[in-house]
């Protein structure tokens, strides 16, 4: 029997003892790391193969306690992965769950960066900040290292899988991964259904707070359009980190949100195999993972960035797999690869800052700003027509203007918008170009949505504000008026055909 496999099984058996002493856990993991290191000469040394052009180490902290080992491929594809080793937040298993992946990834043209993060010892911000710093360095150095800064993923193993999922669900746009790979991940922070030491080491005293436990059980933090696509790799016989209450819950949350997610669940393998060749399904796993990575197409770096801001109609409420089938996704297909269209819609949101769910309080709003769009399509107002929200109608204009001038500060003084053109030249357009969409008709008064308020209150204000700032108006209320047959039963939300119709209308305007 392979010594690595045997060692892994011994560790798993020891760790199943509920009242084991922490020293036993640390000792077995340390012994495993020694065995892994002893086996390493059988593999090509990363950094000394034809696939790796450069191997070097960078400090992530001033004291050098956190470092990042960098592997740059000979033939870069533009894709990069930040690797997060496991080890129960007690040690770092950074060979089979770290550097061992370098040669395979570099062969595919993928730059690879292993973060040897500091252990939390109850302070979760310590490892989180180390990984964030790694992402900043990779994206800041993208041009020099041959990387597309919007094609940087994360790959974590076990407790490192938990940390990778935290980074994927709890990060601001600039340090959020573009895709996620989770090997047998710890997801739950409830030690009754998860790995006890990972929970205790990551949360410390906060493990006593049910709200914190829920927040960092990352299946609860998945958000539509925001949480990046994921691939989850597990074995059904994993007795250390139960798949049903960990990795499978993350997959379920992703699927319920409509986000892209692939689940690879093998019948055997236990826990802790990583990129080790002793895993019985090693070759099949790499082949499938490779295909998944190949189909993740990043936007062109010079693509025209289009931000679709809106409520549930933009979000894709009621449309299965809305990130693929909602109007922004269909708009992307219509506009083609020269554009990068992002969905920043959030259901139930209002333009009004005193509404029941103000859009400008949302993560999606911060993301839209960080996206630095060239074009913004704003489609808000439907929920503002509810009586409980429209009672603040006197503030609708100022809130709309606040959104516009935050997106484009140069419009804060309307008389100065745009640059003066030289004689014989057209004026350079203000960036981003902002399109105000009137709400589509409310074919029914579901949820107190009032089409009369939309027509007589909201749309006139939108048109006046557009005229003041020199913005274009897309009159969806008029252009969609004959498409009542493309609605869900509630009469408020378009179905997938209605989303396509909306995309067609908007695409025609953007192409003018």
Describe the residue ranges of each PLM region:
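Conserved alpha/beta-hydrolase "acid-adjacent" motif
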Residues: 239-246
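Active-site segments of SGNH/GDSL-like serine hydrolases
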Residues: 379-383, 406-456
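Catalytic nucleophile-loop/oxyanion-hole region of alpha/beta-hydrolase
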Residues: 93-95, 100, 115-149, 276-284
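Short beta-strand/loop motif that positions the catalytic acidic residue
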Residues: 232-234
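Catalytic His-Asp segment of secreted/periplasmic serine-dependent ester chemistry enzymes
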Residues: 270-276, 319, 440-512
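C-terminal catalytic histidine-bearing segment of alpha/beta-hydrolase fold enzymes
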Residues: 248-300, 496
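Primarily recognizes the serine-hydrolase "nucleophile elbow" in alpha/beta-hydrolase
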Residues: 133-196, 213
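Conserved SGNH/GDSL esterase-like catalytic core that processes O-acyl groups on lipids
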Residues: 196, 302-307, 313-401, 453
